[in-house]
């Protein structure tokens, strides 16, 4: 048997469907020999049963290793059913971070519950970069319909909040840029953690599934590069605090 044929046979044997078929045939043959006493058929049945079990175990560990590699490569740490569940971990890493980059809308939870941490970040010379939407752009109306609440007011409050904190003349500063395109995901990038999740139809932002990634994975690198690309693209977003 040539090498390529052997590889094909191995791939077929390792398929879950093939494994199940082998196990069923093996059990059937063993049951027949138990009732008729045919040692040859019994030997074949036991051989197939052994092959099926080995294939099942091999497939299980192969899938486990592949999954583990994917998780490690992307740096996935946690999956949260809601953004609200994610907030406690996000708050913890925010308190240790010197800088913040984020894409969203009004960042109400950041302003309401984390203002002290943001001020502390600014006192240490850290910077906050936020990308949001223009309050009066037509695309924002679509998201307001999805969430069934007034987002434009929250964005206007965000701008006033940023101006107020910048007025404290701390070493760091808050920068806000806006655009006219609906973001598909919330993105929150800290010094050593990435948090993100989708904006879903008919759900408030705090009620959608969210993900946490460490700094060593591809996801962190990908999202930070994407943020920087948007931030530096003057045709995409402009200074919202001028």
Region spans (language model):
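Juxtamembrane interface helix immediately N-terminal to a transmembrane segment
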Residues: 1-25
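Signature of lipid phosphatidyltransferase scaffolds
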Residues: 196, 200-242
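HKD (HxKxxxxD) catalytic microenvironment of the phospholipase D
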Residues: 174-211
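HKD-type phospholipase D/PLD-like phosphodiesterase module
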Residues: 140-185
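PLD-like (HKD) phosphodiesterase/transphosphatidyltransferase domain
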Residues: 60-142, 224, 228-237
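Transmembrane alpha-helices and immediately adjacent membrane-cytoplasm interface residues
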Residues: 39-70
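Short acidic-hydrophobic, aromatic-tinged amphipathic segments that line or gate anion-handling sites
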Residues: 76-83, 176-180, 215
């Amino acid at each position: 048997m040539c090498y390529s044929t052997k590889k094909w046979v191995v791939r077929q044997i390792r398929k879950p469907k093939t494994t199940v078929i082998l196990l069923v045939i093996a059990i059937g043959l063993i049951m027949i020999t138990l009732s008729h006493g045919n040692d040859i058929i019994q030997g074949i049945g036991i051989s197939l049963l052994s092959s099926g079990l080995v294939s099942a175990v091999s497939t299980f560990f192969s899938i486990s290793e592949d999954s583990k590699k994917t998780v490690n490569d992307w740096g996935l740490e946690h999956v949260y059913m809601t953004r609200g569940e994610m907030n406690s971990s996000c708050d913890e890493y925010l308190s240790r971070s010197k800088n913040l980059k984020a894409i969203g809308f009004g960042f109400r939870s950041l302003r309401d519950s984390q203002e002290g941490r943001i001020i502390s970040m600014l006192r240490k010379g850290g910077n906050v970069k936020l990308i949001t939407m223009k309050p009066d752009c037509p695309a924002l109306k679509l998201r307001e319909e999805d969430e069934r609440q007034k987002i434009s007011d929250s964005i206007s409050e965000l701008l006033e909040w940023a101006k107020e904190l910048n007025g404290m003349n701390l070493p760091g500063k808050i920068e806000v840029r806006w655009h006219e395109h609906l973001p598909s995901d919330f993105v929150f990038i800290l010094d050593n953690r990435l948090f993100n999740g989708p904006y879903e139809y008919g759900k408030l932002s705090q009620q959608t599934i969210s993900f946490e990634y460490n700094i060593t994975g591809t996801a962190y690198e990908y999202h930070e590069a994407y943020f920087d690309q948007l931030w530096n693209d003057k045709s995409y977003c402009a200074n919202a605090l001028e």
